[in-house]
């Protein structure tokens, strides 16, 4: 048997961290011996645990320690981080460390350095005395890359000290929840976050246009509750189609009936915007008179439209190189405190992979599996609201305005 001592510190009981640690050891056929366990006596007091973890051999023990490391386990002996040079551009040394989306620190030069721009499934490099989390495609030959878990500390999220909608939801997904109560709680979170100067990003799919939630999202942008819009070609095209023709995918938004020749409207829309020189120019020329993109431009709210192989056109502002789009999205998400994902599974998962675990994340979709897939792919902090986005957004805006009136 091989053994290694590890320790945990934080809200180990109410955040279920210690329970998860024991489950990991047992699920991987390991053994443990608890040496010390100090329980915090008050709500804000951290707990501390120290134990010996046993594995059959070095490889088995290393497997267990890797999983424990992801939830905050650390080696009591302070060790310097291990580094190895990248042998070529986009090529990593053996045993390179793969990040989680939790706040991470590395021990370098006798100091704990915070890892900047943390997100999941990336690597850590040391450059000019600072630690950076970067994707594989940004690694260059000679970069000093972190290998192994020595000298790396992960701080997993803990249960909030006060009751919030995120504690109320508990990260679970169910359609059997009081939807209006949840939306009211989310509205309160949004209102209080903006009072503190926080920033909110919205990830939206074209269903926002098709379900007539467009006006509510445009109003949220106009009233200053949205600081960043992340979407694709379709949302912008159909939003502008509504502004020009009053249809979305050829359906009359007011009457709910197809319009003769309406199936061509989105193509006419794209052509008009391209001819005008882009969305901003089309607004300046009076072609686009209202809607989501109109409010973004008029209120200087940045937007990033990422392209896909399904796109018609696309619009001039759409970034067709997905790697460039991902990089721009990552840069734009710096400083964002909350992300609201609206009826777009693939875009939601893509953005979720770029977020640190401390960013509040709300995913709204009719399909419960969308939220489940988002969390299964690592965005465990997300809460799910299983409802029609066409009902959610107007009610959310109404609740925010009610809170404004009371304050």
UniProtKB/Swiss-Prot annotation:
Its EC number is 4.3.1.12. Keywords: Lyase, NAD, Nucleotide-binding. It holds the Pfam family Saccharop_dh_N. Its cofactor is NAD(+). NAD(+) binds at residues 233-234, 312, 344-347, 365, 388-389. It catalyses: L-ornithine = L-proline + NH4(+). It is an enzyme of class 4 (lyase). InterPro entries: ArgZ/ArgE-like, ArgZ/ArgE-like_C_1st, ArgZ/ArgE-like_C_2nd, LOR/SDH_bifunc_enz_cons_dom. Gene3D superfamilies: conserved putative lor/sdh protein from methanococcus maripaludis s2 domain, putative lor/sdh protein like domains. NCBIfam families: TIGR00300 family protein (TIGR00300). Belongs to the AgrE/ArgZ ornithine cyclodeaminase family. Catalyzes the conversion of ornithine to proline, with the release of ammonia. This is Ornithine cyclodeaminase. It comes from Archaeoglobus fulgidus (strain ATCC 49558 / DSM 4304 / JCM 9628 / NBRC 100126 / VC-16).
């Amino acid at each position: 048997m091989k053994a290694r001592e590890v320790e945990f510190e934080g809200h180990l009981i109410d955040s279920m961290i210690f329970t998860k640690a024991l489950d990991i050891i047992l699920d991987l056929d390991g053994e443990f011996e608890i040496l010390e366990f100090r329980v915090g006596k008050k709500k804000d007091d951290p707990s501390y645990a120290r134990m010996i973890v046993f594995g059959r051999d070095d490889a088995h023990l290393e497997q267990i320690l890797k999983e424990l490391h992801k939830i905050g386990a650390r080696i009591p002996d302070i060790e310097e981080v291990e580094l190895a040079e990248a042998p070529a551009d986009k090529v990593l040394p053996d045993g390179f460390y793969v990040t989680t989306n939790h706040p991470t620190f590395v021990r370098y030069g006798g100091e704990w350095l915070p890892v900047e721009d943390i997100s999941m499934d990336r690597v850590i490099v040391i450059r000019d005395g600072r630690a950076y989390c970067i994707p594989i495609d940004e690694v260059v030959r000679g970069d000093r890359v972190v290998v192994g878990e020595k000298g790396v500390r992960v701080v997993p999220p803990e249960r909030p000290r006060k009751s919030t909608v995120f504690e109320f939801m508990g990260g679970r997904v169910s359609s059997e929840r009081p939807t209006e109560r949840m939306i009211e709680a989310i509205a309160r979170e949004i209102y209080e976050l903006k009072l503190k100067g926080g920033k909110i990003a919205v990830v939206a799919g074209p269903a926002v246009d098709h379900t007539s939630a467009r006006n509510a999202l445009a109003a949220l942008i106009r009233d200053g509750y949205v600081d960043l819009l992340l979407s694709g070609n379709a949302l912008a095209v159909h939003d502008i189609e509504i502004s020009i023709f009053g249809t979305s995918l050829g359906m009359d938004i007011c009457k709910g009936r197809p319009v003769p020749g309406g199936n061509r409207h989105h193509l006419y829309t794209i052509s008009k915007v391209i001819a005008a020189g882009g969305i901003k120019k089309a607004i300046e020329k009076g072609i686009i008179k209202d809607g989501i993109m109109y409010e973004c431009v008029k209120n200087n709210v940045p937007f990033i439209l990422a392209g896909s192989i399904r796109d018609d056109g696309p619009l001039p502002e759409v970034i067709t190189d997905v790697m460039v789009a991902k990089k721009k999205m990552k840069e734009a998400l710096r400083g964002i405190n909350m992300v609201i994902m609206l009826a777009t599974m693939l875009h939601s998962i893509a953005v979720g992979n770029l977020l640190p675990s401390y960013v509040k994340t709300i995913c709204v979709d009719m399909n419960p599996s969308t939220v489940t897939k988002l969390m299964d792919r690592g965005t465990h902090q997300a809460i799910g609201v299983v409802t029609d986005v066409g009902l959610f957004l107007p009610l959310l805006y109404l609740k925010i305005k009610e809170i404004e009136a009371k304050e």
